[in-house]
């Protein structure tokens, strides 16, 4: 399951060209694309996100008690202005690049703030809405300290880990949300990281 490089046209923005993006076939119609250092000016973007996103601390029911969600979150819905211009540029560039495969634009931008190594997200697929029944895409841009995104086949099997660094782009496509799960595991030591996840309409 090695990454294979393919060449694409450059987007008409200040973002890095899509040339050199690498696709990894996972099986069962699932794949991931990886492009290192796609977003420029990442220190400025990270600082803006920390300061201006209206972060929320959520709680969820687990058995008979409420527990804190181990990260801060916020989702920019359709029509909401994104907190930094490059995020809108990234959304539009992703839409243009993937439209032949996806067939629709990226519409929402979910943000997760992992404050340190204790913050995490458990194994899951984005299967609320159409992701449960249709092939779709979720595009993730990472800002801040490197963290590993782990993936494993749904129902069990060998897992893989992809370290996402400052400005890196990872796109999960095809059947990935239905046939695979992903997670950001806890680690002993890590600095702050923010991920921005672009999704089409009605994929969560």
Q: What are these language model-derived features?
A:
Residues 1-204:
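Non-heme Fe(II) oxygenase metal-center motifs and adjacent flexible, charged/small-residue loops
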